[in-house]
């Protein structure tokens, strides 16, 4: 179903703001923990970006893919989806406290959070607000996480709140090493994100 695909893709929009990091992570793997801390501190300063890429979702009874445009400006987001989904396009916009999803030829849906919107429309409970961190190659700071670092002291895998995130490749853009290909594995749901163009920004407080 197109609407189901759109809403699942929309959880890329999570947007909980950029709070500080806690000390709730367990780190292992090849990398150097001190270098990882430096890398993490650098990425945490990114509070805006423009992303273009592709996203795919696979569930037991559903699958789909499409193109993704994601504009983030601190706590505001504008996410647009189109492509081989079969029936037009969708746009998700919002700030904390209000989320709006417009689907071509189907209508407008609103909620107070991405999580609420997802649960209202298809009945799934997912940690969607984590993705604003995961897409930058960071663990979300508000729950425990288990990290494995690669030889460059960047995330190789991340386990958090019942999800496993695999970082398959990175790209350097504007002095930042950012995820290029990400796979997310959760209960009965797999998501693949391939980022073709990263434009990170530091917008300030």
Curated annotation (Swiss-Prot):
One of its GO terms (cellular component) is cell outer membrane. Belongs to the LolB family. HAMAP family: LolB. It comes from Pseudomonas fluorescens (strain SBW25). Monomer. It holds the Pfam family LolB. Plays a critical role in the incorporation of lipoproteins in the outer membrane after they are released by the LolA protein. It comes from the Bacteria. One of its GO terms (biological process) is protein transport. This is Outer-membrane lipoprotein LolB. It is a lipid-anchor.
